[in-house]
A protein has these predicted regions:
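Interdomain helical connector at the RecA1-RecA2 junction of SF1/SF2 helicase-like NTPases
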Residues: 419-422
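A short, well-structured juxtamembrane/interface segment
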Residues: 208-221, 488-491
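Active-site cores of enzymes that catalyze phosphoryl transfer or operate on phosphate-rich substrates
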Residues: 156-200, 208-209, 425-487
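Short, contiguous, well-ordered secondary-structure segments
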Residues: 217-223, 227-229, 494-504
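Beta-propeller domains
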Residues: 443-541, 550-552
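Catalytic cores of large soluble enzymes that bind and process phosphate-bearing ligands
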Residues: 204, 208, 411, 486, ...
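PLD/PLD-like phosphodiesterase catalytic module centered on the HKD motif
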Residues: 2-199, 213, 217, 224, ...
Length: 723
């Protein structure tokens, strides 16, 4: 952080500050020329350069002599920021309105503030402060150092031929608790949030989807404008609003819809007649002979030795087995019965009735393979591919609202043609269609598709300034899991770019696969990041992971653990010993009361962080890289799934937009991961879980909060952005 650690300066100042953003959030970082005497934090003002409007950023965390039990917003003139970085979560939309600010240019002013002292000017009264809305004695703020300003930046979703959009799909927030009017001491529930996110136009749904839903809806307006057709390949399709849009525009659609979701239940023993029925039906000969007979009658006749004239030897064998089964009737053990495609079944039926053969059922109906794509290609009225929509967002209410996700739109004939060619290959790679559609299958992709997918499509955007490589899956020769995991071609390319990183690698992943904590298995971006971070101590590797099993060091809880014993949480933070430049955290929520923070809801489904993003050297004009798409960035995605992955190089504004999203998610969950890791560490020592987490959850009333930043213990990632 500051140039000379530990040096106090009476007249101190912010010597450098930088800011960058995406369509939802801005990230800013700054440094001073030393520890600022008496500094209680920084007052931050966003300046709209188009209108001249100055707006203090909101703040919710009170000083430790105060309390904000109702989570009412003040601003940073009341409760300053006790960090050297911040996220402006109200960049385009405030918490109390659905109004979205149009694209604009902005910068930030950062002012050190502290208590009254000779020569210090008082902070002027602010219209966004709310005196009386919190408990405790107010602490008037005075300017205690020279202000600094960030660079100017554009608030936009457009980055040349590419547009990028990010949702607000974090549920574990105090703001959501407040909107849901959750009682103190309780966490919001899944039914509570589900009631809002499934309802088109609901304010909570609208906020959580951000610009991702409008971006997806824009494809239909564009198709009408072009009088064109849309070719889509989707994994999950359940959201009512999006399904209705498909229905309304079905005449323009060609859809490949994969299997999504399954439900396994234990079947009850069905007695003598049902047992006989099950076994008899498995023999075609017996089935033919029983077309006009009840199953119960067949069971009785099979017990009396069916004559050879009526049955073949094979039928006798089957009937004999049926008799043995009927003898056990009530003692028969329940069997697991799996019903497939529970997520898509309703939408599939509705669209199939309208679209006929223009809807292809891509039914894997097994857990080994999934059609994981979520993309659309627009063809103009002449059949020419012109635009692509892709990203990580599934077409479900949770994909839109209850997970972190992104959507990317690319205006390029070459890119659109590559995606349409892939769509055509998928369509030609026909899978068996089970009857009923929910029945189990062992389907996988064919060799022609795999061979074609092993070669990427490469082109340029923005008149040659942006390079783009397009990879599709599956791209390994074999359908099954190979014994020796040779790195697939798409991951080889990704790892080669990570290896070339000069300064930083940032990532967000759902579950790329289990990761060896030693980083020896370079089949996921997580393990590759560990490897490259070990090799280069100057390489910053930061990331957030959704699934606890994908965080290095995960240990499954004992299966025989008594139910009444408190469960030790899985690891929440990972940094290899002696490698502080590598830090990975997993998604977590506040489970215990800390300060004014109340319990939170972590998820409304399985995924929490659903992005599949790697950003390399985002500050570089020429070497920056963005990797995105549907690919989970691990081995299984390459050999088992239908996937698409985009690798964009040389577009710095785009790279910084994706970096902002990564840092937004990472910063949010890091605080919560630290709390959960503290609980884990205590319980591993055989002690009971703490009644309250370590840490007070309030702002400090002295300048000591700066010390860990001055020493370098905190804020390691800031050095990269401020060099």
């Amino acid at each position: 952080m500051p140039a000379e650690a530990g040096r106090e300066i009476v007249v101190a100042k912010v010597i450098e500050a930088r800011a960058f953003c995406n369509n939802e959030v801005a990230y800013l970082a700054w440094k001073t020329d030393g520890k600022i005497k008496d500094c209680l934090g920084f007052m931050i003002t966003r300046i709209n350069l188009d209108t001249g409007e100055r707006r203090l950023l909101p703040a919710w965390v009170a000083f430790d002599t105060q309390s904000n039990p109702d989570w009412e917003a003040q601003d940073t003139s009341v409760w300053p920021i006790q960090k050297f970085s911040w996220r402006d979560l109200t960049l385009r939309r405030s918490r109390d309105t659905l109004q979205v600010r149009a694209p604009f240019r902005a910068k930030y002013e950062i002012v050190p503030v502290g208590p009254e002292a000779p020569g210090r000017a008082a902070v002027p009264p602010s219209p966004t402060a709310q005196p009386g809305k919190y408990k405790g004695t107010p602490i008037p703020m005075f300017v205690c150092g020279e202000a600094g300003e960030t660079n100017e930046f554009s608030v936009t979703d457009n980055f040349g031929d590419v547009s990028a959009f990010f949702n607000n799909g974090i549920l574990s927030t105090q703001n959501l608790r407040k909107q849901l009017e959750t009682p103190d001491g309780k966490a919001p529930t899944k039914p509570q949030i589900d009631a809002h996110i499934k309802k088109p136009g609901d304010p909570i749904r609208t906020f959580l989807t951000g610009d991702v839903l409008p971006a997806l809806k824009s494809m239909f307006a564009r198709a009408e404008q072009e009088d064109g057709t849309l070719h889509l390949a989707l994994y999950e399709l359940e959201d009512t609003e999006l399904v209705d849009l498909l229905v309304q525009n079905q005449a323009r659609l060609n859809l490949i819809l994969s299997t999504a979701g399954s439900k396994t239940t234990k079947a009850k023993p069905a007695g003598m007649a049902a047992a006989a029925k099950t076994m008899v039906k498995r023999s075609k000969l017996v089935k033919k002979a029983t077309k006009k007979k009840s199953i119960a009658t067949m069971a009785k006749k099979s017990a009396k030795k069916l004559s050879a004239a009526k049955k073949t030897g094979a039928a006798k064998k089957a009937a004999g087995k049926a008799v043995k089964k009927t003898k056990k009737s009530s003692a028969a053990k329940p069997k697991n019965v799996t019903v497939w495609d529970v997520t898509n079944a309703a939408a599939r039926a509705k669209l199939s009735a309208l679209m006929g053969s223009r809807l292809q059922n891509r039914m894997f109906n097994n857990s080994a393979h999934i059609g994981h794509n979520k993309f659309a290609v627009l063809l103009d009225r002449n059949g020419k591919p012109i635009v692509v929509w892709s990203g990580s967002t599934n077409w479900t209410k949770t994909g839109l609202c209850a997970q972190s996700n992104n959507t990317i739109i690319i205006e390029s004939d070459a890119v659109a043609k590559a995606y349409f060619d892939y769509w055509t290959r998928l369509h030609a790679d026909k899978l068996p269609v089970p009857k009923p559609l929910s029945a189990p299958l062992g389907s996988d992709q064919g060799p022609a598709l795999r061979t074609a997918d092993a070669t990427p499509n490469s082109t340029t955007l923005d008149k040659g300034k942006t390079k783009i490589d397009l990879w599709y899956s599956p791209n390994t020769p074999k359908t099954g899991t190979p014994k020796n995991r040779t790195v697939p071609p798409d991951l080889q390319f990704v790892f080669s770019l990570m290896k070339q990183a000069k300064d930083a690698i940032f990532f967000l992943v759902f579950n790329p696969g289990r990761t060896d904590p030693e980083g020896e298995d370079v089949n996921t971006v997580v393990s590759a990041g560990i490897d490259f971070g070990r090799l280069d101590p100057d390489l910053t590797v930061f990331g957030a992971i959704s699934d606890p099993t994908a965080l290095p060091g995960f240990v499954a809880p004992p299966k025989d653990q008594p139910r009444d014993e408190p469960k030790i949480p899985p690891p929440a933070i990972f940094s290899p010993e002696g490698v502080p430049n590598v830090l990975m955290i997993r998604a977590a929520a506040i489970k215990d009361l800390i300060g004014d923070f109340q319990r939170e809801l972590l998820s409304a489904g399985h995924a929490i962080i659903h992005d599949k993003i790697v950003v390399i050297d985002p500050m570089s004009e020429t070497d920056c890289v963005v990797i995105t798409g549907s690919h989970n960035l691990g081995f299984k995605a390459s050999y088992a799934n239908d996937e698409n992955m985009l690798v964009l190089r040389g577009n710095r504004p785009l790279a910084l937009a994706y970096t902002t999203h990564v840092l937004d998610i990472y910063d949010h969950y890091k605080f919560r991961a630290v709390l959960e890791q503290q609980t884990r560490d205590i319980m591993l020592k055989g002690k009971p879980p703490p009644k309250r987490p370590t840490g007070k959850g309030f702002l400090q009333t002295t300048d000591k909060w700066q010390d860990p930043y001055i020493s370098g213990e905190k804020g390691k990632e800031l050095a990269y952005f401020l060099r």
